[in-house]
Curated annotation (Swiss-Prot):
Protein name: Heme A synthase
Signal peptide (residue range): none
Chain sites annotated for binding heme: 300, 360
Presence of keyword tRNA-binding: no
Assembly and interaction partners: Interacts with CtaB.
Annotated organism of origin: Cereibacter sphaeroides (strain ATCC 17029 / ATH 2.4.9) (Rhodobacter sphaeroides)
Membrane topology annotation: Multi-pass membrane protein
GO biological process: heme A biosynthetic process
GO cellular component, one term: plasma membrane
Sample GO molecular function, one term: oxidoreductase activity, acting on NAD(P)H, heme protein as acceptor
Chain ranges passing through the membrane: 37-57, 121-141, 152-172, 186-206, 229-249, 298-318, 332-352, 354-374
Name of the gene this protein is made from: ctaA
Amino acid sequence: MAVKKRSIFEEVGQGAKAPVPQGGSIDRGHGGARRGIRLWLMALFLLVMAMIVVGGLTRLTDSGLSITEWRPVTGAVPPLNEAQWAAEFDKYRESPQYRLMNAGMTLAEFQRIYWWEWGHRQLGRVIGLVWAVGFLGFLAARRIPRGWWPRLLALGALGGLQGGIGWWMVASGLEGDKVTVESTRLATHLGLAFIILGLIAWQALLLGRSESDLLQARRQKEGRLVTLTTVLIGVAFLQIVLGALVAGIDAGRGFPTWPDMNGTFLPADMFYVPGVETDWRNPAWWLGLLQNPGFVQFLHRMAGYTLAALGLIFWIFGRRSRHRATRGAFDLLAMALLAQILLGVGTVLSAAEWQVAIAHQVGAVVIWVLILHARHLALYPRVGSIRKGTL
């Protein structure tokens, strides 16, 4: 039988084609899931941002203590008739806030503050529902990229924790002769809200680019800018917590002057705590200082100046980046910081008028997200060699 002669080079250029390089494990078969999960996270981001704004308005309208029970499920249904409204009003009239601050309030006036608090809680329920439907839906369809389900589950767990902290905060204003919630609990509640918002934003940024893009981009990360933005995250978070402490005791309304504080740099009685001797070694004195309007307002101003100064200094470093998108991110951050300074001064001079105060709170959200965006681009620069698919 004749045997066909074959060239020793026949397999080269003939037969099976060379395999085309593939993306990472997350990219393979999960492109649609990445887009879907990112859209779901963006919806959650908008809802959490709305939650922060509505929460701020609820506080500014003194509505947060109008609902004196925690009913996560049955509380979703508001009073539907006169008898139910009367029952809710009776519960509120047993609270110290009603007795000491709102005695004589009419049912119509109560309904106005009730709707603010009910809306705030209802928005929390909506967030929980959107998270659960999205997470369980992607999980059941097996469309969650490898390694991502713990991150997405953690968001839901933090959301549940936030609901519990919210009630823990409200409960602090229903005891004794309290007419407001404990400022430290308010700061805990708001701080966790920003942590959740930041985690959602970060995951959405990552999902906006393919895994192969991120792997290539990370090789060109700008370590100094990553470090600087990490510092900014820490200072910004401290400033957010201090802002909550100021809001919790209405400290902003006691010093409506700028750049001084009622004519002085250090406010009078800044270190005074009623009933506690001034002693640097006494923890009770330190905790008491958090209830001193002059002390917390001074710290909030100083932290604001620090954040603005660091942000503008870091902007100079950001402008030296060899990546255009990174430079643009630092430009946006610098402009937002300047705007936030103006809003902060406006909040002080207006004695925390609600319109200016809520704009200042929204400004904090914007700066928080822009710092994360700048850090993302410092860690994963957009470069011309990376194929399309970037955010």
